[in-house]
Amino acid sequence: MVAIIVHGGAGTIRKEERIPKVLEGVREAVLAGWKELKKGSALDAVEEAIKVLEDNPIFNAGTGSVLTIDGKVEMDAAIMRGKTLEAGAVAGIWGVKNPISVARKVMEKTDHVLLVGEGAVKFARIMGFPEYDPTTEERRKQWQELKEKLMKGEVRHWKKLGELIKEHPEVLRSTVGAVAFDGEEVVAGTSTGGVFLKMFGRVGDTPIIGAGTYANEVAGASCTGLGEVAIKLALAKTATDFVRLGLDAQAASEAAIELATKHFGKDTMGIIMVDSRGNVGFAKNTKHMSYAFMKEGMNEPEAGV
């Protein structure tokens, strides 16, 4: 049974009026992915769904990515095929519209898994991806306001990211992702602009295979939230291990988030999954995580936050 699920990031949506736009965005993405999935390719479905999310400035990936501490955009993305364990990823890339498509090219056109920074940008140009500025005025304004807020008072040094997020949940702008099963294989993909005010050069879980993105013959997972948590727990791979041990995608998602909460507390993580039986799963320990999914037999996607 074929299935696809997408997420638009875990965290706190401060402005309630944004929720309908977020729901519309994940619905649009899952429908675009479903269209490709019905043609038979989970790989095309995952890439297309994530491209739609990257192109929507309400999400923190591609256009509308958040800014680093020095006001720049550095994006991460990864994609992985469960049948062959082929994977491609980029980290700290800038000047491209769709990092997920560059990640796919890394998988298909090189012997490598991960390209970073200037090397990733050079590779993108060689592959024909044109120069593109993903910065939006809204993100620039948010960056200025947040930086001013943090600079007020007696703060003489930058606090650890985890402490900042507890005091200012809006820092956690999270990630987008998709996981699909086409009847033959599971594919997972994730893309992000990272965390607001992250240090230059910071890489989160998204492009780390096994941490934020993973797929094998039994399941696939895409994580969202505070990347350092997913890295330390190898959370995407761990979630698929739960499926190998007999859980379905939903139970495995819940088990993965319980693990994250146990070790690192609430407001840290969300996950989506699909297993090789066509089950979808999603769980979070944050206030919100936008998601939408389609399975065989459904006429319309189910979506929520």
Curated annotation (Swiss-Prot):
Absence of L-glutaminase activity, ability to remain active at a wide range of pH and temperature and long term stability at cell culture conditions suggest that this enzyme is a good therapeutic candidate for the treatment of colorectal cancer and hepatocellular carcinoma. Displays activity at a broad temperature range and is highly thermostable. Optimum temperature is 80 degrees Celsius. This is Plant-type L-asparaginase. It catalyses: L-asparagine + H2O = L-aspartate + NH4(+). Catalyzes the hydrolysis of L-asparagine into L-aspartate and ammonia. Does not exhibit glutaminase activity. Keywords: Autocatalytic cleavage, Hydrolase, Protease. Belongs to the Ntn-hydrolase family. Autocleaved. Generates the alpha and beta subunits. The N-terminal residue of the beta subunit is thought to be responsible for the nucleophile hydrolase activity. One of its GO terms (cellular component) is cytoplasm. Optimum pH is 8. Exhibits activity from pH 5 to 10. Pfam families: Asparaginase_2. Substrate binds at residues 202-205, 224-227. The keyword Hydrolase applies. The record marks 174-175 as: Cleavage. The active site is at residue 175. L-asparaginase is an enzyme of therapeutic importance in the treatment of cancer, especially lymphomas and leukemia. It functions by reducing the availability of circulatory L-asparagine to tumor cells. This P.abyssi enzyme shows 78% to 55% growth inhibition of cultured human caco2 and HepG2 cells when subjected to an incubation time of 48 hours. The keyword Protease applies. Its EC number is 3.5.1.1. One of its GO terms (molecular function) is asparaginase activity. Gene3D superfamilies: (Glycosyl)asparaginase. It is an enzyme of class 3 (hydrolase). GO terms for biological process: proteolysis. Heterotetramer of two alpha and two beta chains arranged as a dimer of alpha/beta heterodimers. The uncleaved protein forms homodimers.
